[in-house]
Amino acid sequence: MIYMRDILMRVDNMETNLKVYCEAVIEVRNEETGEIETYRQRNLVTDYGLTKILQSVTGIDTTIISRCAIGTGSTPTDWSDVLLDNQDGSRKQRVETEMVTSFGGGAAGKKVWIKTFFNRTEHNVVWREMGMFTTGIGADCCSRIVLTTPINKTSDYTITVTWSYIIVSS
């Protein structure tokens, strides 16, 4: 299932339709063998996440989406999600952006990504869900994913999560 949300912006009788979607790339590295498994999954932008994006565009709020949280819950995602089912913790990371020239069909857009590294001692539980937050401690989930393949994180593994928000004009 692909989760994509539409935002309609009107300025002086001009109209631009924007599409917003998220993708997570999860690299699981076995530190004993060097073997890397990569998982890629599209995920849900919540209503709160859309509000944050629009508040950032208009300058109403300067709080940024910068925390990746891990959880063990498995309840399906919903537009109204503001928390993970069972959060184990979160990490704050640097946010980077790049201009994406084309997403097919000639649509130009902007991509923001947050790359988070979890070392061998962090969050050694079965990862079933992840989310992106502004503070990581409250009801401020901007996007959430329930992993199609749960990850059994132990001290043998490090994990790098690259979470992308992609906004394109349509």
Predicted regions and their residues:
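Small cysteine-rich, disulfide-bonded extracellular modules of the LU/uPAR three-finger superfamily
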Residues: M1-R128, T135-S170
